[in-house]
From Swiss-Prot:
Protein name: 7-cyano-7-deazaguanine synthase
Superkingdom: Bacteria
GO MF, one example: ligase activity, forming carbon-nitrogen bonds
Species the sequence originates in: Burkholderia vietnamiensis (strain G4 / LMG 22486) (Burkholderia cepacia (strain R1808))
Source lineage: Bacteria, Pseudomonadati, Pseudomonadota, Betaproteobacteria, Burkholderiales
Gene: queC
Cited HAMAP family: QueC
Cofactor(s) demanded: Zn(2+)
Amino acid sequence: MIRTDAKDGALVLFSGGQDSATCVAWALERYQTVETLGFDYGQRHRVELECREGVRDALKHRFPAWAGRLGDDHMIDLSVLGAISDTAMTRTIEIETAANGLPNTFVPGRNLLFMTIAAAIAYRRGLRVLVGGMCETDFSGYPDCRDDTMKALQVALNLGMDTRVVLETPLMWLDKAQTWQLAEQLGGAALVELIRVETHTCYVGERAELHDWGFGCGECPACKLRKRGYEAYLKGERVTEAPL
């Protein structure tokens, strides 16, 4: 396994959602330079992209120790992905399970493209670590969120670019309650509140009502998962701490 240290710079895939915002904080706690990367692929919940700047600004102003580490932000137009996708993430259709057993919110190739583009940007920027919020503990079954997929992709990227990049997925084995707990461990109640209020998870892009767990419709799979995780976190239902 390729080893990294705090002197290495990191590029975090940052959508504006809970998981990726937690990953930004995780990286800021570890690396001297942290840049962020977002993608506009015509997602139905495009409001998440509008949250990105607010989250970055809040991290700088509320956490002085991290302010000097948070570097440039990059936004990539990946509308071609939306153009070739017929999913509930890119079309206004009912969210349901497809014939292949996967939810129709699955966008084929999304994380593969995201990480490949991220690796190319990291190569140019001299950053050795890529950080993503992929998770297969209480996820929706997306095959491109699996640990095996990320490990295989790391090998392919290093071979294809003759480089030594590391793909870090700090949430891979955490459930949503532990993800909230990790935020608390990283930045206390202030970071939990920042993530609760400033990030966006809802698949349908609803941001009119602030619930205890954050903004959202409360009915889509993403909202239900976030709500359930937040409630479990408040009850302290996880016995062990989230690993840092």
